[in-house]
Amino acid sequence: GSGPAGISAALYAVRAGVDTTVLTKGPGALDRAEKIENYYGFAQPVSGAELERRSIENARRLGVQFVTAEAVGLTYTDKLTVETVGKDYPADAVILATGASRAVPRIPGLAGLEGHGVSYCAACDAFFYRGKDVAVLGSGEYALHEVQALLPVVRSVTLLTNGAPLAADFPPEVTVYPQAVEVVLGETVVTGVQLSGGVQLPVSGVFVALGVAGSTALARKIGAEVDGNRIVVDARMQTTVSGLYAAGDCTGGLLQVAKAVYEGAQAGTEAAKALRKG
């Protein structure tokens, strides 16, 4: 992430002598702020876009590398590895700073069946649906990543775009339904979905992969503890997974630049300290 938390973390890590790369899909929430006048050091209001531009420029000056890529997954084998569209990035430490997770659409039945057929991680849960029919809710690269994880395991995958246009090239064996999802069916477990127009599809699982993978979605993929849309961290910004840190809006609390910068500084410092210890 290249918002206040991500750039702050990168600044502290690179100045501590750590090779530091920022993976960013592009401007985030800060870029949309028209005027900021409560941030330290500015005599006049500054736009979010300008503050972001200056921060990135400073990070580049200090040696931070920037890669434009959309993170779609996070795994751990010999190293933590961030999966992006087209390439994987192994790292000794990862700091999640991609902002607050997007709200899940208020589709009746969706929230109530989480863990009982509704999932947010194909890599985690595909095994439980082997030989069954499932649906993926989404339309972009993140949804494609989940589809690709499911296809070798399940019997069939149906894509539910919920009215959004397709933003990725999906395999031909995936059936696409563009209609709005009206309700997720099932009393104790998912039994299907109902779309606008009265269409009902029998499925055993619904995998939510809307928009881009937020910090919380990535944390879930590797087993880090989350609390709702918030990643659980300690005072060092360390998650429950060794080597994985989180900072900024994704940890909850005050959604302000100053708080994000502090947490990024803490995460970058602690990650660098841990790497020096080996």
Identify the residue ranges that each predicted region occupies.
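N-terminal-biased segments
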Residues: G1-V22, L96, A100-R106, V193, ...
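Beta1-alpha1 glycine-rich phosphate/pyrophosphate-binding loop at the start
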Residues: S2-R53, N58, K132-D133, G138, ...
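Hydrophobic/aromatic beta-strand patches that form the interior of the parallel beta-sheet core
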Residues: T21-L23, V67, I95, S119, ...
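A Rossmann-like FAD-binding core segment of flavoenzymes
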Residues: L30, R53-T77, T81-E83, D88-A91, ...
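Short loop/helix-cap segments at secondary-structure boundaries that form the rim of catalytic
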Residues: R32-A33, R106-A111, F127-Y129, L166-E173
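Glycine/small-residue-rich loop that forms an oxyanion/phosphate-binding "nest" at active or ligand-binding sites
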Residues: L62-G131, L137-S139
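FAD-site-proximal beta/loop scaffold in flavoenzymes
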Residues: S101, R106, G112-F128, L210-K259, ...
